[in-house]
Amino acid sequence: MGKVFAVGVGPGSQNYITEIVRKVIVGADVVVGYKYTLDIISSLIQGKKIHVITMEDQEKTYQQIKKELEGGILVVPFTGDVNFSESEVVDRLIEIFGDVEIIPGISSIQVAASKAKIPLDKSKVITMHVTTSIEEKKLELQKAVVDGYNIILIPRPWPKDPKKHFMPSEVAFYLKKNGFDTSKIPVHVFESLTNGKEQTFTGSVQELEGKEFSDLSVMVISQTRSESYISF
């Protein structure tokens, strides 16, 4: 068996790919990933054996590569940081290949926090971008709003199943349904961070009702005040 890497390649711009991840990708024999992620690293994977996968065919692809890899190097790139919102896939890679080296990347949540100027240590980071149930995460969202935390939320696009679709509009209706005055909750929605097609919505959570956002969206609810060291 060769060497297997799972790496984060940043939110969309090659400027956000770390040097160590660049070196690993350049040294790969085989690269497997989703189209958007592969597009981020397109200039680094010329001449390599590339597999473009989807949720439906990824298992078949991984199993085939396991048979063929031998002493080669496989790199599986992930958008953003491999350690955030990707555990279901990473866990499966470890089950299939055994020893997988994981190298982190810069996440869209870090970029969103920077643009909104909120500290991560005063924020709750919640990802709905999973295939499993998000009911507990919804309760976590409610509690974070009540407790006054900043919230960085990755919504869940699932247009084929409205019951699972939980984008900014659905978040707004959910909070209102559970008794929150969403007109008083400030929010940013950042779309397509760093990839040259960025758009930003700034307003109240109430104003998100009925609005459509891309799959590449991050919500930031800002609830804390600035506290510099001069205040203490």
Which sequence ranges carry the predicted segments?
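Class I S-adenosyl-L-methionine
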Residues: 1-103, 111, 206-209, 216-218
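A contiguous loop/helix-start segment that scaffolds small-molecule binding in enzyme catalytic cores
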Residues: 2-6, 145-232
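Class I SAM-dependent methyltransferase SAM-binding "motif I" and its flanking Rossmann-like core
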Residues: 13, 80, 84-149, 202, ...
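Structural motif
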Residues: 33-36, 54-56, 79-81, 129, ...
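Generic domain-boundary/flexible-linker signal
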Residues: 42, 85, 134-136, 162, ...
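A short acidic, often aromatic-flanked loop/helix-cap motif at beta-alpha or helix-coil junctions
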Residues: 56-62, 108-109, 131-134, 194-198
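Generic hydrophobic alpha-helical segments
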Residues: 61-65, 137-141, 171
